[in-house]
Amino acid sequence: MSERKYFGTDGIRGKVGDSPITPDFVLKLGWAAGKVLARHGSRKIIIGKDTRISGYMLESALEAGLAAAGLSASFTGPMPTPAVAYLTRTFRAEAGIVISASHNPYYDNGIKFFSIDGTKLPDEVEEAIEAEMEKPITCVESAELGRANRIVDAAGRYIEFCKGTFPNENNLNGLKVVVDCAHGATYHIAPNVFRELGAEVITIGCEPTGININDECGATDVRMLQKRVLEEGADVGLAFDGDGDRIIMVDHKGLKVDGDQILYIIAREALRQGQLRGGAVGTLMSNMGLEIALKQLGIPFVRAKVGDRYVLEKLQEKGWRLGAENSGHIILLDKTTTGDGIVAGLQVLSAMVRNHMSLHDLCSGMKLLPQILVNVRFTGNHDPLQSTEVQQVAKEVEAELGGKGRVLLRKSGTEPLIRVMVEGENEEQVTAMANRIADAVKHVG
């Protein structure tokens, strides 16, 4: 695979107004993608976005570029990323494009693509798009220019799809649910899904202004959700990120339930129902407690590199159906083609209803080991992870853990960050260890 100039682990992302997230770049990206995708026959593209104010500008730029290449665009308006993947499949479009920076602040944005089957674009297609970017824009003949239209019932279609993943014989009657949509793309979808299935729904983070997405709310900050669940005496809280492909939950005691615990609940329920195919895929960041708990159930577990696309690749390689990141990307291949927060949440609620158990009790079979993550920002083009000083400190910490924990250092695929993770039996000890390594990274970074 050749070195990428623009595409990262999750499409193209950056600060709006800085290269590459500028109107002229995105217009050219639309044209280059159009040229590559037009070779495959279909000339229809689905375009969705989250609630960032910059989405309008970037949507227009993409449309212009695609039209110049002869491709037509169908707009969904604000729509979760997994909804765009679903609509791309059902409309038999050549590709889907999502304008979103997921869990990042409003001033960032990004572009990611889905192929005709609702999965991320293969590497070779992304590389072909990058190659086209180096060429000057040429416009097709006027009669061949692309058109644009809106999919008026996009939200309703996706709501029905989500509800269809919940068992017909069950409902959410009598369940009090707090839903935090991060002022993002699920704001007009998630509350309706849970309400229509019978739950009493209390909403927070459902008033997008274009600049409040992910602002002290949603899957990356559940403090407000925890507070509200306790205040309302709710049975459960569900928090989505800005584009709806992640979920973090909160139990009735106000305790956070992360992606590892959600994967455990769904895998155990699939085993109980005789529907588990193979095992489960986590990542290098998955808690050792998940691995131990699944092993006790006899469920095979393997780790992929961090990033939902790598979880998906590992699932396809193994022929398995369940995978997750602890950050809340849950992939259920018997129901969806990508991480889907709403669908994952429904499977957990289904397990609660079916077993007459609280979320707290469903988690009780798994004990999370203390895991400390420290993000260290770095500048320049050098890689702090190549530093002998950093490597030496990491080696010392690993020796001190003595096989009863893990050290993981990695570069973020979307931001100039080094992520330092230390896991072990004693929280105080692993916190000190993580800070020790982080200090070494800061020193060289």
UniProtKB/Swiss-Prot annotation:
Disulfide bonds: none annotated. Its cofactor is Mg(2+). It catalyses: alpha-D-glucosamine 1-phosphate = D-glucosamine 6-phosphate. Activated by phosphorylation. Pfam families: PGM_PMM_I (PF02878), PGM_PMM_II (PF02879), PGM_PMM_III (PF02880), PGM_PMM_IV (PF00408). The keyword Magnesium applies. CDD domains: GlmM. The modification Phosphoserine is found at S102. Mg(2+) binds at S102, D241, D243, D245. GO terms for biological process: carbohydrate metabolic process; peptidoglycan biosynthetic process; UDP-N-acetylglucosamine biosynthetic process. Its EC number is 5.4.2.10. PANTHER family: PHOSPHOGLUCOMUTASE (ALPHA-D-GLUCOSE-1,6-BISPHOSPHATE-DEPENDENT) (PTHR42946:SF1), PHOSPHOHEXOSE MUTASE (PTHR42946). Catalyzes the conversion of glucosamine-6-phosphate to glucosamine-1-phosphate. This is Phosphoglucosamine mutase. The gene is glmM.
